[in-house]
Amino acid sequence: MTEKKAPFGNNFTPEQRAAALKRAAELRAARAEYLVRVKSGEVSITDALEAGKGDPVVGRIKAKRLLMALPGVGAAKAQSAMTAIGIAESRRVAGIGQRQAEKLIELFG
């Protein structure tokens, strides 16, 4: 008989799948912990944008989520700033350009 394939071509063994799920959970927890540090004011927007260029944990955070973690910034303010600056909804911190970063620092720094 032919072997039944997993949907979408995931050919992981159960051990590989478990390891990948564990790693994904660790990364999500690390991103959440970083956002808590941003929310508390321990990390500034300048620090976060700089860290996003080199740290894959920070770089994978959605830009809007980072802005919403800033003290005093909610969904509406984050969205209007992103629209004004020209940052796409799907953009992650690592993908923010230098000029966009400068404008974010000007607004929220």
What is each of the regions a protein language model found here?
Residues 1-65, 69, 76, 80-109:
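Structure-specific DNA junction-binding interface
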